[in-house]
Amino acid sequence: MAKEKFVKNKPHVNIGTIGHVDHGKTTLSAAISAVLATKGLCELKDYDAIDNAPEERERGITIATSHIEYETENRHYAHVDCPGHADYVKNMITGAAQMDGAILVVSAADGPMPQTREHILLSRQVGVPYIVVFLNKEDMVDDAELLELVEMEVRELLSNYDFPGDDTPIVAGSALKALEEAKTGNVGEWGEKVLKLMAEVDRYIPTPERDVDKPFLMPVEDVFSIAGRGTVVTGRIERGVVKVGDEVEIVGIRNTQKTTVTGVEMFRKELDKGEAGDNVGVLLRGTKKEDVERGMVLCKIGSITPHTNFEGEVYVLSKEEGGRHTPFFNGYRPQFYVRTTDVTGSISLPEGVEMVMPGDNVKINVELIAPVALEEGTRFAIREGGRTVGAGVVTKITK
């Protein structure tokens, strides 16, 4: 019955809970679901269903993630919760579950802890743009001054990592109490606090720009020459729209070239345009087959540039995940798989880091042997002889 009400006419936003272990992330996820279920805005998912997260494999990395969905009056949300700290690290670095914003859960009884800090840092690094804070376990704090102190600490921590700490919405409450209330079918004082939190999420986390509204980009997968028609490049459009007559650029590996789109085909049919998510063939005017190769991208003119040097945040696969069995050191030269191709690059480790063990996450500097279309937020895999040994995201372009 509840399924019928899920009409996708509301704007869609992806969020997730982050924060230190045992501060109540999963309980809050269950409480949000339970409180909104009393209003008929979602299906009830209990704590155990969320906590026993199925393991998924994303680029060969095992990640346990729970997905729940719910609605507020204004929006439709997909919400991610991870049971273990390592799962968060992997999830955020691989972008397995992209977040438009996050709810940072901090126990009011304990204040910010090491993983609180690490999750905020990761959010900054991997580009989670907005954070709303829930101070959980408010029922365990009798002292209003203590609550204020924790709030100040959290704001300071956010500011340290370049989030607007002073303007960040912070709502206090108790996920457990709200969950207990909701199970009786009522929204009491604790449930109201969860609704207040969701109202802040609605207000503070903007609706993300849809992929089709972003500048056109298509990674080149294959190149063909068609007699009498010219060169066709195929691939899946990552973002934006491409129309017949558009001027586009071919970026990466070699010097950037300009060309004009003379045709767009999908399943052998001629189209006026292709958009994000479509697998298409794009016919290019005056471009020779040998001018284009896998690993380049077709894009809107000036929207992305080729680079060889960048900083990245990476997760190194553990031995159990099929990764390396031994650490790597400064100067390690693996392949970086970006979109559709491998490019060799050398890794410099941060000062004071001697080596990186399988299962670690670390910030690295990379120099590629050929330029690739890159921007902050571009994801990549690190490969060695065709097998994935790490996953990462570009956090800063340096050259």
Curated annotation (Swiss-Prot):
Its EC number is 3.6.5.3. This is Elongation factor Tu. PANTHER family: ELONGATION FACTOR TU, MITOCHONDRIAL (PTHR43721:SF22), ELONGATION FACTOR TU-RELATED (PTHR43721). It is an enzyme of class 3 (hydrolase). Residues 174-176 are annotated as: G5. It comes from Wolinella succinogenes (strain ATCC 29543 / DSM 1740 / CCUG 13145 / JCM 31913 / LMG 7466 / NCTC 11488 / FDC 602W) (Vibrio succinogenes). Gene3D superfamilies: P-loop containing nucleotide triphosphate hydrolases, Translation factors. CDD domains: EF_Tu, EFTU_II, EFTU_III. The lineage of its organism: Bacteria, Pseudomonadati, Campylobacterota, Epsilonproteobacteria, Campylobacterales. Residues 60-64 are annotated as: G2. Residues 81-84 are annotated as: G3. Pfam families: GTP_EFTU (PF00009), GTP_EFTU_D2 (PF03144), GTP_EFTU_D3 (PF03143). Mg(2+) binds at T26. Monomer. GTP binds at residues 19-26, 81-85, 136-139.
